[in-house]
Amino acid sequence: MSLASGSRTNTFRPLHTAPQLTTPARADAMEAPVQTLTFQRRQTLYHNGDPAQSVFRVRDGLVRITRMTPEGRILTVRHLVPGDFFGEEAFMDGQREEIAEALTTAQIEAIDPALINQQDLMSITRSLSVQMQRSMEYQYHLQTGDLRQRVARYLLTLADTPLARVDAQGRPVISATHELVAEGTASTRESVSKIITELRAEGLIASGYRSITLVDREELDAVAEGF
């Protein structure tokens, strides 16, 4: 099993303007034995080029899959929520093609592909099918609207994931840097910082050290729609 130093051991609000990271209602129990691993926030699960020896499922937390462009930019290509399977390269005895990183503290189930039976395989197939639809929606939103709209959509998407908490005023507080938002919107940190500054000046968000608070979610939704 090729993992980067792992230790053993919400539902998204419907918004037609933002890609939805819907958590499966329940995760079917695997018949194959699983090994549960715990990863801390921003800890890497595996790197590009690592041997693909296990299939994984998110038990708890939020994980992202990234790729690096020839210019050295990191792009987020996939988000994984509880119940999602990933690491399907293990079925082909290949190498990891991407980087998997825990965005929150996460519990991950590692499964030996040689022990997966037909029932487990159907569960994995259903999960990957749902993720493909989600990925298509995510890519659509990356290619429509200007950067201001894309940033607003991404913040709305992250607001109802394990990456966010609710403050005393009931507002979502997202644990995210400008760099993370840039990687999730196919942009640069400098361009995203300018948009964040504008949204803060308009009173739609508040930003602090590695955090962004959604102050006016309704108006931010309007920005995402292009109004």
Model feature map: region roles:
Residues 121-189:
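Polybasic "coupling" helices that flank or enter modular domains
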Residues 63-75:
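A short beta-strand-loop-beta hairpin characteristic of the jelly-roll/cupin
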Residues 1-41, 85-86, 90-92:
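Cyclic nucleotide-binding regulatory module and flanking cytosolic helices
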Residues 45-50:
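Short phosphate-coordinating micro-motif centered on Lys-Gly-acidic
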Residues 78-133, 137:
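Cyclic-nucleotide recognition modules
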Residues 160-227:
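Phosphate-/nucleic-acid-contacting segments
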